[in-house]
Amino acid sequence: NDYKEEVSLMNNSANLKHYAVFKACKNLEEVYVLYLTKRDDNANNAQFFIEASDYVAQWGDEKLALRIFLNSIETNATDVSILKYIAYKASEKEKHAYALKIYQKILQLKPKEAQSYRDVALAYQKVGKHQRALDVYNGIFNKTYSNVPSFSGVYKSINSEMKKLILKNRSQLDLVGTPSRFLHLKSSSTQARIVFEWNSNDAEFELQFVNPQKKFFKWNHTKSENASRMFKEKEQGFYMEEFLLDGIGTGEWIINIENKTRNM
């Protein structure tokens, strides 16, 4: 297919609306007073806490910014969809230790979901706990977590992530119990690996990948075109898809995403 124009990006009409309100404040004290005034009304709105935290950080008070950010976890302690979003933002801010704690909490709340284990393993890697990460991966491949119906939906990603973990940290790892196919790995040609994650099984969207030659392909995550896939996600508990772009060469790729969720 030939690419002619971009599809519209995922639209969120509430995007940064709280940030704009805080910008009207003249100093940090006013920002914090406004935050306290609005906090209770936004207790279940993680975006409010994150935007408030970001704005406070711009004033140079990192401790207060972190405290506000952590408030978003406290007020949404059992909502997995919101906790996933907060964990994404924590990783984005390179607060990997907090992201790990959130993913561990999600694992406690959703021990039957396949991605709960994968997310914890990846979070362990990001804080340098490579053996702990390997232990989780081994548990997946050795079928230790019998409470999970299946890990087939995340096998592609955990296979890539486990290989990378071992190749980079082999000398530091105890490989006892690791499946034999991971014991004699060799570095292979680099592929562009893109992983998309979302925080709700009901999210409907369309991805469009455009290569430097303006050729494109699409991937739909909608009930009308991919119902069996979405059923599998709910059954196994995963919210992600991995794409490997072979022969990527040089030049710019464009990735568009269009929101297909109704009533948003």
Language-model-derived ranges and their functions:
Residues L9-A14, N42-F49, E62, N76-L83, ...:
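Generic helix N-cap/helix-start motif at coil->alpha-helix transitions
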Residues K38, N71-S72, K105-I106, I140:
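Canonical positions in the second alpha-helix
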Residues K38-N42, N76, K110, T144-V148, ...:
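Alpha-helical junction/boundary sensor with strong preference for TPR arrays
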Residues E51-V56, Y85-A90, V120, E161-M162:
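Structural register within alpha-helical repeat arrays
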Residues Q108, Q125, H130-P149, K163:
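TPR/TPR-like (Sel1-like) alpha-helical repeat modules
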Residues L165-M264:
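Intrinsic-disorder/low-complexity signal
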